[in-house]
Amino acid sequence: MKIINIIKGVGTQLRSLGMVFSHAWRPRETLSYPDESIYSPPRYRGRIVLTRDPDGDERCVACNLCAVACPVGCISLQKAERDDGRWYPEFFRINFSRCIFCGLCEEACPTTAIQLTPDFEMGEYRRQDLVYEKEDLLISGPGKYPDYNFYRMSGMAIDGKPKGDAEHEAKPIDVKSLLP
């Protein structure tokens, strides 16, 4: 009985060593992270940014839909109005220590101003540094939708142009002529 147990023990040890050595020469799955970039899928939800129109103006019209859609309430903003009647956020703040990167704010945004990028390197040593203001979130480009301009598409009156002169807008209909 003792000899059989010794033979079984030696057999299991040899089998374990065989597995270890067979994996020793296989290709590695581990990456040296800072030196080699990590692949992230195209729809990966990472850092949140605020984008600009093709004209260079910020896209956000401070409609507050992103803050309402956020399940953890990490977005806060205050609406203000420019001289030409266009709305903009006086301040726009995201607390990334609370954000769960669900993407509901991006889906709720009618102007595609708020977008999630594949960037995930947002580590900070202090919690206060994870609260990003509008200046930190605003990027110089249009993001995922380079040709979209909310004010041209929406049909809102633009200074110097009457209603119906925007790119994708039909001329106004005279409603009184439709009455019986």
From Swiss-Prot:
GO molecular function: 4 iron, 4 sulfur cluster binding; iron ion binding; NADH:ubiquinone reductase (non-electrogenic) activity; quinone binding
Binding site for [4Fe-4S] cluster 2: 70, 99, 102, 105
Region (Disordered): 161-180
A GO BP entry: aerobic respiration
Annotated InterPro entries: 4Fe4S_Fe-S-bd, 4Fe4S_Fe_S_CS, NADH_quinone_OxRdtase_chainI
Similarity field: Belongs to the complex I 23 kDa subunit family.
Protein name: NADH-quinone oxidoreductase subunit I
Species this chain originates from: Aeromonas salmonicida (strain A449)
Name of the gene encoding the protein in the UniProt record: nuoI
